[in-house]
């Protein structure tokens, strides 16, 4: 089997290495977001037909306004939300503190965590309280498009 570069081959279209398909943020929110977060990759059914939606980002600072992500639900899809520490010697240490609310319960995350939000469960607000080193964030929704209302303020 030959090893191909990511621009050639029948299935190269399935390899996403940027966030070009991410929804456009309004200008005011983008200014705030870019100061604490760096989106890495975004995939959904528009970027790769048939794919479900996934977002990845690094959080490396506390937002100037918190909470920035507000409570919402996804009535027709489950979601996974992850926060992973970046210390390879201690991967369970989050390297910061995130307050994440699910079902009306606020939880303080200090360890690498994945949260399951089944369809219909209210989740967020989310507050980034402390960042000692970058925190890897991802979210996965089990449908082709993230079509909910804006979850930020």
Region locations from a protein language model:
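Extracellular structured ligand-interaction cores
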Residues: 77-81, 95-97, 135-137
């Amino acid at each position: 089997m030959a090893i191909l570069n990511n621009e050639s081959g029948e299935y190269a279209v399935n390899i996403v290495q940027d966030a070009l398909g991410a929804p456009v943020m309004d200008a005011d929110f983008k200014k705030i977001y870019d100061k604490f977060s760096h989106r890495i990759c975004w995939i959904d059914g528009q970027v790769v037909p048939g794919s479900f939606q996934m977002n990845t980002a690094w959080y490396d600072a506390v937002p100037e306004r918190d909470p920035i992500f507000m409570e919402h639900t996804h009535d027709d899809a489950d979601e996974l939300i992850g926060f992973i520490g970046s210390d390879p010697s201690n991967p369970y240490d989050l390297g910061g503190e995130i307050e994440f609310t699910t079902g009306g319960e606020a939880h303080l995350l200090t360890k690498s965590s994945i949260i399951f939000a089944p369809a219909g469960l209210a989740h967020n607000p989310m507050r980034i309280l402390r960042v000692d080193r970058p925190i890897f964030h991802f979210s996965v929704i089990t449908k082709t498009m993230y079509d909910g209302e804006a979850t930020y303020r």
